[in-house]
Every structure is written in structure tokens, then in C-alpha cells.
A protein has these predicted regions:
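DNA polymerase processivity clamps
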Residues: 1-178
């Protein structure tokens, strides 16, 4: 799948802002999934998980998935906006640059958590009594136009939405009267 860097840049910026520092190597990067639904880039820092979606092109979709480490993601984000990047089952390429997938096993539970948070069953989680729920906006400041949608029952997860992005973040519980 061929994608202009201009379209890819917001997703790469979101992932770079979320990962790094003391993040374990198996999640310090982006998990790439290509299917008929389009190209999806997953990232997490153990508190927040995001899915960026790049719309499918007219090319027939070849299904593949792999992990790109943070160095690869940073290299892609520094490319000129007018360049095109090609995602294939063997890795990512753009003109004379080739990036091979990293040898890491991204935890698939991240994808399941995001999918579950965006299903209506999420609303059936039990009401939490005796706690105030808060979110640290500093953890999400790098995501442009992000909206936090708190759980209506006070559960400790909130949905995240931004252009081309969906995800969830964990809350910080504060006992009443603390």
C-alpha cells in the first residue's frame, strides 16, 4: 500500500509522542496492520492505546502485520511530506530507503482493548461508586484535536477520538474526600 508521508505524518507524530523513554522495546514503536479495511498503526505506552487508520487505496489489499521500532517511525516522520512510502509484507520502503520490521512481539491485547472500548458492551461495565475519575491531559497533549470521552459509569477507561484516530486511556482514581 502506497501512502504519502503527508497523510502518514499525524499518525507517526501520535505514536512518537506516546512511546519512548522507559517504554519496553516490545511496545516502543508502531504495530502495522494492513487489511481490506485499510492501514492501521497501533501504539501504546501501557496507560494509553491508540489506533490510527489510513484509508485504503484502490490497490487490492495484501494482508500483513509487523512491528516497526521507534527509530524506524522517527525516520519515516522526518521524510519530506511530498514523498510516498510503500508498505509491503517485507517492510516499508521509499525511494532508496528500506526499513525491515523489528523482531518484537507486540501484545495483541492492545488491539482487543481498543476494539472492546469502542463496542456498546463497554457501556455495560458496572458503575463505580466512591471514586472520582480523572485523566492526565499531559499524556495526550501531542495528539492534535484529541477528545477524551469519559466512561458514563465512572469506569477507569475513557475513549479517545481525534481525526483518523481512536483509542482509550486509563484514568487515575481518586477516593472521595482525598
Amino acid at each position: 500500500m502506497k501512502v504519502p508521508v503527508r497523510e502518514l505524518k499525524p499518525a507517526l507524530t501520535n505514536a512518537i509522542g506516546l512511546t519512548g523513554g522507559d517504554t519496553p522495546s516490545m511496545i516502543n514503536g508502531v504495530y502495522v496492520v494492513n487489511s481490506k479495511a485499510g492501514l492501521k498503526l497501533y501504539a501504546t505506552d501501557r496507560v494509553t492505546a491508540i489506533e490510527n487508520r489510513i484509508e485504503p487505496t484502490v490497490e487490492p489489499a495484501v494482508e500483513f502485520e509487523y512491528f516497526l521500532d521507534r527509530e524506524a517511525v522517527e525516520l519515516l516522520s522526518k521524510m519530506a511530506l511530498n514523498r510516498a512510502v510503500t508498505f509491503t509484507p517485507d517492510g516499508v520502503s521509499s525511494q532508496n530507503i528500506e526499513i525491515k520490521p523489528a523482531d518484537e512481539n507486540f501484545p495483541k491485547t492492545v488491539i482487543e482493548l481498543i476494539d472492546n472500548a469502542w463496542k456498546d458492551a463497554w457501556l455495560e461495565l458496572p458503575k463505580v461508586e466512591g471514586w472520582d475519575i480523572g485523566y492526565n491531559p499531559a499524556l495526550l497533549k501531542h495528539i492534535k484535536d484529541v477528545v477524551i470521552i469519559p466512561h458514563p459509569n465512572g469506569f477507569n477507561q475513557a475513549r479517545l477520538i481525534a481525526p483518523g484516530l481512536r483509542g482509550l486511556t486509563m484514568a487515575k482514581k481518586v477516593k472521595h474526600g482525598s
